[in-house]
């Protein structure tokens, strides 16, 4: 794709460099009290996107065509649709923010169509094997068995398990808070 020259749109009220736009957006996310992990996700998406923009220095230079060029390059580089959709979700929030602040022209951003993948469920034998108590005194095997049973029983994510503390467990009522 060729180099684009920017023509300032008179309807846009502010012209900000990408780095400054990113800072304003991330501060807005902090003011909204978004989780640090969400803010990190947005920051990583923006930095990845900005690194792949050729000659684009200002937010008002980001157009649907620029975004689609980015996606085509990613597809040609072998990126999976699921990964691209994850990026699109973060960038869509940024684009909407920029359009609301009149830093750039609004444009619709839709997720890419993914082929349905059918994951094979575990067989009854595999589930029984996963839930079977270890036949050893090795601590690691007991830990792994406990974690698998915890995941199966609660459906919690790994990040929840990592942050779980003894004070979060009511052993008498057998409840986790």
Predicted regions located by residue number:
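Conserved catalytic core of the tyrosine transesterase superfamily
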Residues: 1-177
């Amino acid at each position: 794709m060729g180099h684009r020259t920017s023509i300032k749109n008179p309807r846009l009220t502010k012209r900000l460099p990408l780095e400054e736009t990113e800072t304003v957006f991330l501060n807005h996310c902090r003011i909204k009290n978004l989780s640090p992990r969400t803010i990190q996700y947005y920051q990583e998406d923006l930095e990845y996107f900005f690194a792949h923009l050729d000659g684009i220095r200002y937010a008002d230079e980001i157009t649907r065509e620029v975004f689609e060029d980015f996606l085509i390059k990613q597809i040609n580089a072998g990126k999976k649709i699921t990964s691209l959709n994850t990026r699109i979700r973060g960038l869509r929030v940024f684009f909407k923010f920029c359009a609301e602040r009149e830093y750039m022209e609004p444009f619709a951003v839709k997720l890419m169509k993914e082929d349905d993948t059918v994951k094979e469920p575990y067989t009854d034998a595999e589930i029984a094997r996963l839930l079977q108590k270890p036949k050893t005194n090795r601590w690691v095997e007991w830990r792994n068995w406990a974690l698998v049973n915890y995941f199966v029983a609660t459906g919690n994510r790994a990040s929840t398990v990592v942050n779980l503390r003894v004070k979060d467990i009511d052993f008498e009522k057998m409840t986790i808070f």
